[in-house]
C-alpha cells in the first residue's frame, strides 16, 4: 500500500474500499444466556409412592448476526429436557411393583459452517482484507479468500443434532415367606430406545469483490465490482445417524436366609437380552440360565458356586450354547480373632 492508501485505512473515510474490520468483535457478543427450570413432585402413602423430576435447560451461544434472516436463527444453542419418574406400589403385603422411567430430549444447533472452520477463518482473515458488506449490501470478499466469516454465521443456514432417549424398566417382586422364610421371586422387564438425528437447512451465499480505481496520486476515482460464488436457495435434509434399541427380561427365584453363624444365598436366574441397531449385522441376542449358591460361615469363610448355561446369536448355529461352571473360595482374615484388635491390619 502507498502512504495515501494507508491514510485511507487510518481515517476510515472509505471503509468499503479500505476496511479495518475487527472480525472477532463482529462475530462474538459479550454474553451468553442460560435458562433452566426444575420441578420435583413426590408423595404417596404406605401403599403407593411416587417421585417425578422435570428439568428444562436452554443455553445460547456467543455469536452475533444470527437473526438477519426470518427463515432461521443460527445462534449456537443447547436445549435439553429430562423427565424422570419412579413409582413404588405395594400391591399386597408381600407383592411390590416398581416402575422407573427416564425420557431425555436434547437438541444442539449451530451455523452450517463447521465451528472449527469458522474459528479458523476469524483468526486467518486480516482486518484489511475486505469489508463485512459492500456498498450494494453484498457480502464482501476477494478472490484470494472466497469466503466471509460473518456470512458463514448469518447466511449458511443451520445444522441441528437431535437426540431422543427413553429408558424404562418394571420390576415385580413376590415374597414367598409363606412357603419358607427367605424365599422370593422377582421379574424385571426393561426397554431402552436411543436415536440420533441430523436436521440440516443449508445454502450457499455469494460475495462481491470491490477493487479501488486510483489516479496517479492515489486519489480514489471509483471502483470495480466482481461477483464471487453463486447463492443458492435454502435446502433441507434430514438423516437418522444412529438408532439403538435394547430389551431385556430378567427373572429369578431366590433364597436368602441366615441361621446363626450360617448364611445361605441361592438364586436360579433366567436372563434374556436383545440389542438392535441401524445398519447391517448389528443385532445381538443373548440368553442365559444359571444357578448361584453362596455359603458364608461366621463372616469369615465363604464358598460361591455358579453353573451358567448361556448362548448368543453371534455364534454359529450348533455352537451357540454352552455350560460355564465356576467356583470360588474366600477367607476374610481380618475377621479372625487373632486379627480383630490388630492396630496394623484391619
Predicted segments, located by residue:
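Residues on the lipid-exposed face of transmembrane beta-strands in outer-membrane beta-barrel proteins
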Residues: 37-45, 83-89, 168-174, 251-255, ...
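Transmembrane beta-strands of outer-membrane beta-barrel proteins
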Residues: 50-52, 97-99, 183-189, 264-268, ...
Amino acid at each position: 500500500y502507498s502512504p495515501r492508501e494507508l491514510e485511507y485505512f487510518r481515517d476510515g473515510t472509505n471503509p468499503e474500499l479500505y476496511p479495518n474490520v475487527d472480525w472477532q468483535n463482529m462475530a462474538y457478543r459479550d454474553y451468553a444466556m442460560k435458562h433452566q427450570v426444575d420441578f420435583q413432585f413426590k408423595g404417596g402413602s404406605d401403599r403407593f409412592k411416587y417421585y417425578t423430576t422435570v428439568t428444562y435447560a436452554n443455553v445460547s451461544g456467543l455469536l452475533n448476526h444470527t437473526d438477519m434472516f426470518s427463515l432461521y436463527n443460527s445462534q449456537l444453542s443447547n436445549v435439553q429436557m429430562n423427565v424422570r419418574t419412579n413409582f413404588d406400589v405395594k400391591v399386597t403385603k408381600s407383592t411390590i411393583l416398581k416402575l422407573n422411567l427416564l425420557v431425555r430430549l436434547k437438541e444442539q444447533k449451530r451455523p452450517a459452517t463447521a465451528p472449527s472452520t469458522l474459528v479458523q477463518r476469524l483468526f486467518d482473515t486480516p482486518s484489511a482484507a475486505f469489508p463485512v458488506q459492500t456498498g450494494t449490501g453484498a457480502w464482501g470478499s476477494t478472490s484470494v479468500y472466497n469466503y466471509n466469516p460473518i456470512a458463514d454465521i448469518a447466511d449458511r443456514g443451520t445444522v441441528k443434532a437431535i437426540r431422543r432417549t427413553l429408558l424404562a424398566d418394571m420390576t415385580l417382586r413376590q415374597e414367598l415367606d409363606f412357603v419358607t422364610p427367605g424365599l422370593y421371586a422377582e421379574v424385571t422387564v426393561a426397554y431402552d430406545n436411543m436415536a440420533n438425528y441430523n436436521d440440516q437447512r443449508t445454502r450457499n451465499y455469494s460475495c462481491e469483490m470491490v477493487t479501488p480505481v486510483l489516479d496517479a496520486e492515489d486519489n480514489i476515482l471509483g471502483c470495480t465490482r466482481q461477483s464471487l460464488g453463486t447463492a443458492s436457495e435454502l435446502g433441507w435434509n434430514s438423516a437418522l445417524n444412529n438408532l439403538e434399541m435394547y430389551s431385556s427380561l430378567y427373572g429369578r427365584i431366590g433364597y436368602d436366609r441366615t441361621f446363626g453363624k450360617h448364611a445361605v444365598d441361592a438364586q436360579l436366574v433366567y436372563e434374556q437380552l436383545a440389542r438392535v441397531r441401524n445398519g447391517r449385522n448389528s443385532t445381538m441376542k443373548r440368553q442365559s440360565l444359571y444357578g448361584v449358591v453362596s455359603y458364608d460361615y461366621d463372616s469369615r469363610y465363604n464358598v460361591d458356586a455358579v453353573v451358567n448355561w448361556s448362548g448368543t446369536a453371534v455364534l454359529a448355529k450348533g455352537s451357540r450354547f454352552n455350560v460355564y461352571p465356576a467356583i470360588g473360595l474366600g477367607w476374610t482374615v481380618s475377621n479372625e480373632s487373632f486379627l480383630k484388635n490388630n492396630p496394623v491390619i484391619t
